[in-house]
């Protein structure tokens, strides 16, 4: 596995970090891009990666009333679509784990599913988030 910056966790050539900051989806994505070259909100490409991210979030989230939800790098770009065609890092969606398909536009992981299912929330709400580089 690749060497990660201090405080980042390594998994299959990528580095991940949960940030206990409340940000809107767009601000969280911008924050991730500022952490390192190629940084973005986390994209989840397999069940194995989903399980890794779920464990990382569970272990690193600081408990507050806002920690029931954590942004991932997926946003609905068009009300007519159920999902956008790509993650915020530009990679295509080849693994999916939706819990419901409403058009609240931005997706994240929900505590009551042990951070394993993708749930739609309003992009403008501030929540914790996970970055990947």
From Swiss-Prot:
Q: Where's the C-type lectin domain?
A: 11-132
List, alphabetically, the InterPro entries matched.
Answer: C-type_lectin-like (IPR001304), C-type_lectin-like/link_sf (IPR016186), C-type_lectin/snaclec_domain (IPR050111), C-type_lectin_CS (IPR018378), CTDL_fold (IPR016187)
Q: What tissues contain this protein? A: Expressed by the venom gland.
Q: One GO term of the cellular component aspect?
A: extracellular region
Task: Quote the subcellular location field of this record.
Answer: Secreted
Database matches in Pfam families: Lectin_C
The organism's place on the tree of life at top rank? Eukaryota
Q: Which UniProt keywords apply?
A: Disulfide bond, Hemostasis impairing toxin, Secreted, Toxin
Where's it mainly located? Answer: secreted
Output the SUPFAM superfamilies linked to this UniProt entry. Answer: C-type lectin-like (SSF56436)
- Disulphide-bonded residues: 4-15, 32-131, 106-123
In alphabetical order, the GO MF annotations are: toxin activity
Q: Does the keyword Disulfide bond apply?
A: yes
**Assembly with partners or alone:** Heterodimer; disulfide-linked.
Question: Which protein family is it in?
Answer: Belongs to the snaclec family.
* Role description: Interferes with one step of hemostasis (modulation of platelet aggregation, or coagulation cascade, for example).
The entry's other comment says: Shows greater sequence similarity to the alpha than beta subunits compared to other heterodimer snaclecs.
The protein depicted here goes by the name Snaclec A7
Species, as recorded: Macrovipera lebetinus (Levantine viper)
